[in-house]
Amino acid sequence: MIHIRYKLKASEVHGIGLFAGEPVKTGQLIYTASPLLDLNITQEQFNSLDQKEKDEILWWGFFDEPSQKWHVDFDVSKFINHSKNATVSQHASHKEAHLVALRDIAEDEELTQNYLEFETEEDLLKRGIKI
């Protein structure tokens, strides 16, 4: 669930991006997981899907090692693009999925995350994401 006002619009990073709809302060909570709405499935369930369904999960989601489940967000957080100079990140003190601002973020600035926090370089390259 996104906890700030936001906008979806064309991104200079890739396709559509998620942009702050208000000024955001360093450390401010941006996103938390929504266990009742997000998709969380086991490897066995993933294996039972047809290839098109798997492709959707591989594109929009990721395999969460700690829970040993495939995860896909239900909300617009899926439009947070990758950047090595990310504006948001997970804080090590939280065990559940969440994102906080790494620095002050201006209104209309794109929210980005370093995908290497939860995926390998190999995974990103397979998806065509520039590292």
Task: Give residue ranges: language-model regions.
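Conserved catalytic SET/PR domain of SAM-dependent protein methyltransferases, capturing the structural core
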Residues: 1-131
